[in-house]
Amino acid sequence: MSMNMKKTIVGLLTAAACLLANAGVIHFDDLPGDETLPIAAGYAGFDWTNMGTVRFDAWPGSGFEAGTVSGDNVAYNWYGAPATVASSDGGAFAFTGAYFTSAWVDQEISFEGWRSGQQLFASGAYTLETTAPVWIQLDWAGIDTLLIYNSSPTPWAMDEFTVPEPGSLALVGTSVVGLMAARRRRKA
């Protein structure tokens, strides 16, 4: 294998590692899990409207328990009302996805992605059950607000809220630019 081929392979592997290793996952496990408390504005860089956390064992046999993917807590929407997750500083973010489970009865959940008051994205409806979490992956970039609404006036549970860290995107971009420069130099 030629030296140039080795460099290309190493560069591609580095770019791939940046994408995989640096997803920011919000687990909610560093919060108290007291269902009477809201998630504080600014938590993990977001403002959480109409949302709290609850411990997995607060309601045995519920979707809160079934929907806990990691640790002890899940986030949920108070009283089954629509919830929003907005960037605390007003900047854009990318929402990869999260695990969702219905707390009490099967229901549907939908999403909208907004930026500066303009709707950029809207999802179809996803069915949530009470017995197991469903991974919902949207991969929406450039939003500053995520609106989550559901068909039933009962709560849903959310865990593993995943957003890529800006640093990982910059590393990938740097790797790609480096690969392009190396290929141009080799062709010259």
Report each predicted region and the residues it spans.
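Bacterial N-terminal signal peptides that target proteins for export
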Residues: 2-10
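N-terminal hydrophobic or amphipathic segments with adjacent small-residue motifs
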Residues: 5, 17, 111, 167-172
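Bacterial N-terminal signal peptides
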Residues: 11-18
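Residue-level detector of transmembrane insertion/anchoring sites
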Residues: 12, 79, 87, 173-174
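Sec/Tat signal peptide C-region and signal peptidase I cleavage site
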Residues: 19-23
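Surface-exposed, well-ordered secondary-structure segments
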Residues: 24-162
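A short, hydrophobic C-terminal helix/tail in secreted or cell-surface proteins
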Residues: 165-183
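Short, charged juxtamembrane terminal tails flanking transmembrane helices
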Residues: 185-188
